[in-house]
Amino acid sequence: MKKILYINILFILLLSSCGQKSQEIEKKTKANNAREQKAYAEALRIAVLPTLDCIPLYVAKDRHLFDSAQVDVRLLPFAAQMDCDTAIIGGSVHGVVSDLVRTERLKRKGLKLEYPITTPLQWQLITNKTARLKQLNQLGDKMVAMTRYSGTDYLTDQALSGVKTSAKVFKVQINDVLVRLHMLLNNEMDAMWLPEPQATTARLYKHRVITPSEKTKEQLGVIAFRTDLLQTKNRKKQLQAFIKAYNNAVDSLNTYGLSHYSGLVLKYCHTDEKTVKAIPKVTFNHATAPLEKDIQKAKAFIPKL
């Protein structure tokens, strides 16, 4: 009997000990979650895309340049500009990698934005090799994939300005840049605007470039920040530190070349090694505001939308 009693007591003590440990673990988990939520709320949050203009941010994050600048930056990945817009409109991010047409439209709708950084964002208008389209005037009655209210919408109009086609050109909204590329590779679209590195992938598959955005001599890529979310002394300090880390990432990219960071391109742009090796040389610039003439051209396009 005594032996059974001892066993029961030992079992009860063991259960009590396990219960206490479970409570301690739960308490620590809640405390850790609370700390992380607080850190996340205090961090500078940026909406990014799987495109080459975001690479300085990925370099700064993965190579701890933000940490060296003593700023906590969280990069929130999206596949479409529209989703980035939703994030910055809702205030879940402080900044967004975008283009001037989109951001000027957001400003027209009442959102206050500032542009401390111009990015090397460029697109290429690429036609499906099976469509045998070699010139812009052959796009009549064809579908061109782009994003409405964006730089690619603007560039489509610019490219076709003064061009006589046999019929109307259909601008088709495909927001997700990875889906857009997939549609080209599967021969589901006649033509489309693609940024890097997606444009390089398309070229490797022998699809034809009929016009690059560089022809317009405009730089539309920007990193935009919500002015009203950066009013406190701490947020302003964070932005300054962010720019410092960004510039350091740019220096590293220009010194060592994009090939040195091929792993980051693979990781964040969801591409392949063959594409990474074939990407043309890109020069990244320190943080500078966009040219006023480029802002005005984007503004002038807005009333058409």
Functional labels for PLM-detected ranges:
Residues 100-101, 171-265:
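Pocket-lining segment of extracytoplasmic ligand-binding domains
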Residues 1-16:
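Sec-dependent bacterial lipoprotein signal peptides
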Residues 24-166, 171-172, 190-196, 208-212, ...:
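Short, glycine-/small- and polar/acidic-enriched structural segments
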Residues 18-21:
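Bacterial signal peptide processing site
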Residues 25-32, 36-44, 52-55, 191, ...:
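An extracytoplasmic/periplasmic, membrane-proximal ligand-sensing/linker region
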Residues 130-137, 161-162, 167-170, 181, ...:
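Proline/Glycine/Serine-rich low-complexity intrinsically disordered segments
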Residues 61, 83, 87, 92, ...:
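Extracytoplasmic/secreted proteins, especially bacterial periplasmic and envelope-associated proteins
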